[in-house]
């Protein structure tokens, strides 16, 4: 994977964690870096379209694991929102064999995103004794899948009973789809509860907020990537929020991709950034509920854009917020923030946080 340009120092107030541009000002190096990644993704999508056909482009995202193999002729797609696993191939010879191999590897893949290149067809998926999907999928007998023998038997069952084919005019696409268990989201969340609790205690951030951010950002997908090159469970961008957190901790440079793909490191960094937003960048907001709404929105779109909703002067913006009720602050941010994504983001995270508080 291409090494990216380092980002020069930016005013911390103008940094968001999960996005790279929300109307805030970035320097030329960051713009060039972002444009370079956009070009890379555009080329990758174009290559997939050439091989698979028009409207058949599927690329990894925050809530979608997509891995190509077999010279891009086979792909595994886990939709963590819908709870479905779709294995497809356009291989002209022995398509069932290609599907079988991909099914087994997907069911038994480990929890090490840094070892997998989602932007190539390199077959770098290794079978793990502790599969990431263990408990999130059961076989045709209702049993979770840990060992290769059970995965192989399930693959044979799927190919015999659920194999489908369709034509897109260019290729015949063979596929099988596996439904994850109904509570797959909770199963994934449970994997990270210990890490969340540790970061919560370390930075004084509510566990329910961390979990709500993780659910909204990645649906607890540790392989999460985005077109803005945000990485991991909490979708941290190396050169913005990642660098800001490192600087606050007395570290130089930026967190590496492998660092942010490590679940514990990602949760620690994302939570540290939430604490910075709460205690420093938006610390002038007195009411804790109003400040929480501002922090949530800022995690997506930057603290600067949040304050500018109320005034172009940062101090005056905080003063205005302090005259408002929390309900009015919420209403303002969900209706007047210039970014539709940030407006929806506050609603989603706030709703998710309520559900975690009830548990």
Swiss-Prot record:
It comes from the Bacteria. It is a lipid-anchor. Its EC number is 4.2.2.n1. Residues 1-16 form the signal peptide. It is found in: Cell outer membrane. A lipid is attached at residue 17 (S-diacylglycerol cysteine). One of its GO terms (cellular component) is cell outer membrane. Keywords: Cell outer membrane, Cell wall biogenesis/degradation, Lipoprotein, Lyase, Membrane, Palmitate, Signal. GO terms for molecular function: hydrolase activity, acting on glycosyl bonds; peptidoglycan lytic transglycosylase activity. Belongs to the transglycosylase Slt family. HAMAP family: MltC (MF_01616). This is Membrane-bound lytic murein transglycosylase C. The gene is mltC.
């Amino acid at each position: 994977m291409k090494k990216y340009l380092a980002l020069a120092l930016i005013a911390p107030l103008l940094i968001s964690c999960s996005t790279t541009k929300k109307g805030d000002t970035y320097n030329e190096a960051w713009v060039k870096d972002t444009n370079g990644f956009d070009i890379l993704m555009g080329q990758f999508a174009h290559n997939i379209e050439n091989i698979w056909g028009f409207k058949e482009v599927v690329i990894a995202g925050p809530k979608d694991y997509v891995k190509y193999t077999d010279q891009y002729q086979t792909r595994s797609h886990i939709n963590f929102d819908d709870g479905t696993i779709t294995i497809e191939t356009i291989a002209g010879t022995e398509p069932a064999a290609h599907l079988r191999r991909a099914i087994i590897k997907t069911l038994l893949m480990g929890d090490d995103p840094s070892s997998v290149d989602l932007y190539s067809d390199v077959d770098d998926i290794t079978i793990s004794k502790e599969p990431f999907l263990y408990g999130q999928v059961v076989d045709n007998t209702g049993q979770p899948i840990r060992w290769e023998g059970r995965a192989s038997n399930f693959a044979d069952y799927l190919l015999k009973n659920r194999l489908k084919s369709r034509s897109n005019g260019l290729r015949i696409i063979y596929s099988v789809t596996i439904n994850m268990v109904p509570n797959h989201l909770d199963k994934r969340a449970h994997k990270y509860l210990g890490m969340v609790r540790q970061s919560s205690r370390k930075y004084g951030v509510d566990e329910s907020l961390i979990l709500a951010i993780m659910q909204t950002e990645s649906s607890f997908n540790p392989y999460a990537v985005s077109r803005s090159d945000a990485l991991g469970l909490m979708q941290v961008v190396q050169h913005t929020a990642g660098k800001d957190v490192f600087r606050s901790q007395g570290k130089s440079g930026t967190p590496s991709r492998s660092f942010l793909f490590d679940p514990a490191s990602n949760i620690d960094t994302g939570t540290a950034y939430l604490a910075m937003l709460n205690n420093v960048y938006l610390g002038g907001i007195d009411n804790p509920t109003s400040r929480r709404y501002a922090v949530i929105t800022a995690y997506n779109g930057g603290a600067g854009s949040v304050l500018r909703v109320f005034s172009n002067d940062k101090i005056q913006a905080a003063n205005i917020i302090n005259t408002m009720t929390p309900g009015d602050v919420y209403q303002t941010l969900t209706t007047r923030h210039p970014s539709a994504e940030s407006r929806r983001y506050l609603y989603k995270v706030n709703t998710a946080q309520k559900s975690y508080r009830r548990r």
